């Protein structure tokens, strides 16, 4: 177990959780950089968005017990490596619902937020963040999210709406911490 303060952001694809996470780093929270086996997107920064690794590396580290939490989403691994956490630092992290459940057990000093956004805004964000969006992939992510995020609003501490004003959403999170 860790005594670090942790803000956990959970939200569907296109909800703006990564943009909120980025803004929270300007307010004294350090981003936990997760590992993933997914392909790099146009707007990704290696070592800042994620640590990009292959599936073999990921599976070996899982088998060695080196991930605090991990999940498979759309056929790709995502997880937080033990080496990513240092004692005494306050963190912010974006995760899926299974990651949220794992982290709440490891970090009892956490505050969790579901980042909610209307579907039109979500879709436009997803389409605009990639240079050549693959509509089939985006639709699959949305369908998967429909199932995966079912009932998450009842499990988190707060629900934050992020339809049009990210600074307003960030301020609500900061007021709640």
Can you annotate each of these PLM segments?
Residues 17-18:
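Walker A/P-loop
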Residues 9:
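Hydrophobic anchor at the beta1->P-loop junction of P-loop NTPases
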Residues 1-4:
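Phosphate-binding P-loop
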Residues 132-177:
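Small-molecule kinase domains that catalyze NTP-dependent phosphoryl transfer to phosphate-bearing small molecules
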Residues 36-91:
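ATP-dependent small-molecule kinase phosphotransfer cores
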Residues 92-96, 106-127:
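Conserved phosphate-donor/acceptor-positioning beta-strand/loop module used by diverse small-molecule
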Residues 26-34:
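Post-Walker A helix-loop "phosphate-sensing" segment adjacent to the P-loop in P-loop NTPases
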Residues 12:
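P-loop (Walker A) phosphate-binding loop of NTP-binding proteins
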């Amino acid at each position: 177990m860790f005594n670090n303060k942790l803000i956990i952001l959970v939200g569907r694809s296109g909800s703006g959780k990564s943009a909120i996470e980025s803004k929270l780093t300007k307010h004294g929270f350090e981003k936990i950089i997760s590992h993933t086996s997914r392909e790099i997107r146009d707007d990704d920064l290696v070592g800042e968005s994620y640590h990009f690794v292959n599936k073999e590396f990921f599976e070996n580290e899982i088998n060695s017990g080196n991930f605090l939490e991990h999940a498979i989403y759309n056929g790709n691994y995502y997880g937080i490596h033990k080496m990513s956490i240092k004692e005494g630092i306050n963190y912010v992290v974006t995760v899926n619902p299974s990651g949220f459940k794992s982290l709440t057990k490891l970090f009892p000093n956490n505050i969790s937020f579901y980042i909610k956004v209307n579907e039109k805004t979500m879709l436009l964000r997803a389409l605009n963040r990639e240079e050549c969006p693959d509509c089939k992939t985006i639709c699959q992510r949305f369908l998967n999210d429909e199932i995966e995020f079912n009932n998450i609003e009842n499990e988190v501490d707060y629900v934050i709406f992020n339809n049009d004003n990210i600074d307003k959403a960030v301020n609500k999170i900061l007021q709640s911490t």
